[in-house]
């Protein structure tokens, strides 16, 4: 008779570290100064910087986490910055249009 085959020991699964609820502010660049709170009953997520006072509020779902509210804030800031660039480009094109310069030379 032969020996019994040895069973491999089952390794315990590592738990994922908890997600952060404090983040770096986009405006004043202080680390861990932005705190996030979620009100799942009313479906609202809030961010507030303790240093510069910036805040952001967005709609959340039952599955939302604080990082989702923070990423929504980043996306909103990028959208505002892109909108401002587009307005500046349009104003620059209107101010320096070749047609306007040609009409001024005619007169």
From Swiss-Prot:
Q: Which GO terms describe its cellular component?
A: nucleus; transcription elongation factor complex
Report if keyword Transmembrane helix is assigned.
Answer: no
Mainly resides where?
Answer: nucleus
* Example GO BP: transcription-coupled nucleotide-excision repair
Residue positions binding Zn(2+): 25, 28, 49, 52
Record bears the keyword Membrane: no
Alphabetically ordered keywords of this record: Metal-binding, Nucleus, Phosphoprotein, Transcription, Transcription regulation, Zinc, Zinc-finger
| Superkingdom of source | Eukaryota
Q: What's a single GO MF annotation on this record? A: RNA polymerase II complex binding
Q: Which residues carry this modification: Phosphoserine?
A: 97
| Cellular compartments annotated | Nucleus
Role played: Transcription elongation factor implicated in the maintenance of proper chromatin structure in actively transcribed regions.
Q: Which family does it belong to?
A: Belongs to the ELOF1 family.
Q: What is this protein called?
A: Transcription elongation factor 1 homolog
- Native source organism of the sequence: Schizosaccharomyces pombe (strain 972 / ATCC 24843)
């Amino acid at each position: 008779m032969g020996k019994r085959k040895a069973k491999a020991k089952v390794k315990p699964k590592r738990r994922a570290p908890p997600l952060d609820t404090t983040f770096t502010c986009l405006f004043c660049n202080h680390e861990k100064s932005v705190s996030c709170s979620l009100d799942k009953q009313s479906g609202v997520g809030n961010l507030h910087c303790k240093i510069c006072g910036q805040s952001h509020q967005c709609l959340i779902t039952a599955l939302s986490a604080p990082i989702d509210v923070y990423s929504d804030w980043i996306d909103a800031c990028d959208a505002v910055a892109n909108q401002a660039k587009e307005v500046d480009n349009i104003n620059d094109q209107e101010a320096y249009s070749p047609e306007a310069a040609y009409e001024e030379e005619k007169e």
